[in-house]
């Protein structure tokens, strides 16, 4: 039987687990209070270090929602949200095959309240929220200890990130939906009550207010502390500003998004990838100057030792995994045709003849031998340029500095400074991606469209595309995008199928929880602008 993840019992489990730690018992095994815990960590902040590391570790772990015996190879943490949501859009194409674990997202059957996708999303994000709550509940909110300020900021920032992700998955965008149902807000203060009685959904407004309160406090703490992060797994001040810039952008509060994007750029040491940097397969190393925040993967991590249950397996074309044996991730030929030849990003994908100018000769030989379809992505590299490697211990992007430039450009234009937005956009693209680029937009909306086009190219495969579709009130028109016949749709903006249903078992267990309207997958339509691919027919979803 599959182990379904539910909020209420997991809250209780979290309380039970917390009760087994050395922070919860005195030497004679008497249970101590929350105030006493705060006193313990104030006297020895190092006792909280492992809990803070666990918050970051929760971003990607294998088989934490299901069990390993269930063999659900998409149960890999936050990266499964990236892959599933990318599969729901218009720009990432893949065959509906047993080797594509995200076929249900591509054909929208993941809209069901029993889908693996919604169970994984809900469980992954609330699991991390509960881990963050354990840290938050152990530190005095007004602590002046630099280490504890830093630890508390980590938990608050990640909790905000998780709730922000949830609200984008389970509800339409903020603007115009402020009174709609948001998320159940589980905190360090109400966890026991939730475990006993369940939790209702807050409104969208209340959810965003909560997210911003966490981020505001995290920024306050990161400004005050003198402790620096050990590596980019953790949230620094520039990253916290970056997360808040995303939130304000989603809220259409462009003036505040602009302030935070500029603050992030002022505080960060990150610099954009140069044209030379991305003229070859890249995007796998957290130490790259462009990365502000990421998921650090080691060869010892379970997602790595599985070999095939990880982001590179499902995404990568140049390494061994599900993608390279039939689940090939490809750019829409329609979007590919819109990339100028002068733009280095055109080489992030094979052309119609299966060739990319960005590939070293050995990599081109490898992928030609694998018979990869036209338009297959070669954006993502492999460890040590070992083409075909089964070592998939590569890092995963959560935030790059390029995003801050594009938020700045959009926010400038949408808050009234159209010429400033155009200037920021032109400066960024010509310096780092396409020296011939020129945006000549004269209205805020036209600049926003131009920025959206750049985001579609720049962050292809990085888990942002579907959230952009939602915040910009776009539909999903796949005509001419090269999708399999069972996944060709023209979904209008606001269609209920665009948001996920809460897992059925969660609603059954939590009497206070109201679900989104239950919907069925849309009916495919004929693709009157169809594009031919070379397809591989592969019958199973198990690699040996």
Predicted feature residues:
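Membrane-proximal, proline-rich intrinsically disordered regions
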Residues: 20-80, 315, 326-327, 335-340, ...
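Conserved, well-structured interaction surfaces
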Residues: 94-170, 202, 219-227, 391-396, ...
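Conserved small/polar residues in nucleotide/adenosyl-binding loops
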Residues: 534-540
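Sec-dependent bacterial lipoprotein signal peptides
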Residues: 1-18
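Hydrophobic-face positions in mid-chain alpha helices that act as interaction patches
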Residues: 63, 70, 258-401, 435, ...
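Short, surface-exposed recognition loops and adjoining beta-strand edges that mediate ligand/DNA contacts
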Residues: 29-35, 70-81, 170-179, 183, ...
